[in-house]
Curated annotation (Swiss-Prot):
One Pfam family cited in the UniProt record for this chain: APH_6_hur
Function as written in the Swiss-Prot or TrEMBL entry: Potential phosphotransferase that inactivates hydroxyurea by phosphorylation of the hydroxy group in the hydroxylamine moiety.
Protein name: Hydroxyurea phosphotransferase
Keyword terms: ATP-binding, Kinase, Nucleotide-binding, Transferase
Entry keyword annotation includes ATP-binding: yes
GO molecular function: ATP binding; kinase activity; phosphotransferase activity, alcohol group as acceptor
Source species: Kitasatospora aureofaciens
Gene: hur
GO terms, biological process: secondary metabolic process
InterPro entries: Kinase-like_dom_sf, NH2Glyco/OHUrea_AB-resist_kin
């Protein structure tokens, strides 16, 4: 019989799936608990930040995710013959456990809250088949649970950008060239739909901005987006390729993780590499390097990047801000030819 995992948050037991409190320490002392721990190799400790975010912002789905983690961890450790091999890691919507497969292969078990963005992740990973990205080993459709190849979570490109921004941007450019060479599979969300939503949201967002110059800037970015929105493209986009989503690997030096896949124009992919690790004066050469390596038409890439600026600005306004983010303003001014 499968045991329920000993799941802790900051060393304290969390509720089990049936709503009862789970005594992790007591469980670990029982015969059943010791047998379970021999299989998984460790107590699974859930990062408190993940729990807090899901309970505060995730609504019913977030609470269900947290309460279901003990049973879900146990289910997939047993189903896929896995043993926990280290402390849990997390993003805002996912728990990642380093594991070892029955044959000794290192892997990562990713349990996440299913949503529109995460639903496309296995589709994209299968299409890329490890070319420039983490390799998908197993996938459960109903829960969205993934088993991925193990990368080095302690070595990501964010560390390199601080020392050598040009080298880091070159890595991202090379990955984008490979990833966007693949045509998007049928059924993925399209950039045309996203662009239409952005354009529809600009008038209200601009009206909330305190500065007239920023209102004009946002509208000008939207005008550039409108020029290309009718031809959204058909490439498989990562949509979140910032430096923290590029990890060191063994079979390749750097590989992309955590895609939020979209079918569209590769020009929509550039902004994270322009604003992450931002330094004034670097926007121009970063844009030149990215468009050159990926092989993009500069004018279309400029317009789609300004569209991505619109997206980030709308998110800020939705969160109650009345001023545009400084990094996005700097990028927009360079691409619109207004930088001093």
């Amino acid at each position: 019989m499968r045991g329920t995992p000993a799941v802790l948050v900051d060393g304290k037991p969390v509720g089990a799936k049936d709503g009862s409190m789970f005594d992790a320490a007591g469980f670990a002392r029982t015969l059943k608990g010791r047998a379970w721990l021999r299989r998984v190799g460790a107590v699974v400790e859930i990062p408190a930040e993940l729990v807090e975010v899901q309970l505060r912002y995730g609504g019913a789905a977030g609470r269900e995710f947290v309460e279901g983690l003990p049973g879900r961890v146990a289910e997939f450790l047993e189903r896929w013959g896995l043993r926990v091999a280290g402390p849990a890691m997390h993003g805002m919507t996912a728990l990642v456990l380093p594991v070892v497969r029955a044959d000794g292969t290192e892997a990562a078990l990713k349990l996440l809250v299913p949503d529109e963005e995460s639903a496309g992740e296995p589709v994209a990973l299968r299409a890329w088949d490890g070319r420039g990205c983490v390799r998908l080993l197993e996938w459960d459709g109903p829960t969205g649970t993934l088993l991925l190849e193990r990368l080095d979570a302690g070595r990501h490109l964010s560390g390199l950008v601080e020392r050598d921004a040009r080298a880091a941007v070159t890595v991202v450019a090379g990955l984008l060239a490979r990833l966007t060479s693949v045509r998007a599979p049928e059924g993925l969300r399209g950039l045309g739909e996203v662009a239409a939503g952005l354009l529809a949201g600009v008038p209200e967002a601009a009206g909330r901005l305190a500065d007239a110059g920023e209102r004009r800037l946002l509208r000008d970015c939207a005008a550039a987006l409108a020029e290309v929105a009718a031809e959204p493209g058909d490439r498989l986009l990562h949509w979140d390729l910032h430096f923290g989503n590029v990890l060191a690997g063994e079979r390749e030096p750097w590989l992309a993780i955590d895609p939020k896949p979209l079918a569209g124009d590769p020009g929509f992919e550039l902004l994270p590499a322009l604003v992450n690790g931002f330094r004034a004066g670097e926007v121009g050469w970063r844009f030149d390097l990215l468009t050159g390596v990926v092989g993009l038409d500069r004018e279309r890439a400029r317009a789609w990047t300004l569209g991505r600026v619109v997206q980030n600005c709308l998110w800020e306004v939705e969160d109650g801000e009345v001023a545009l983010p400084e990094r996005e303003v700097a990028v927009a001014e360079v691409l619109l030819g207004r930088a001093g």
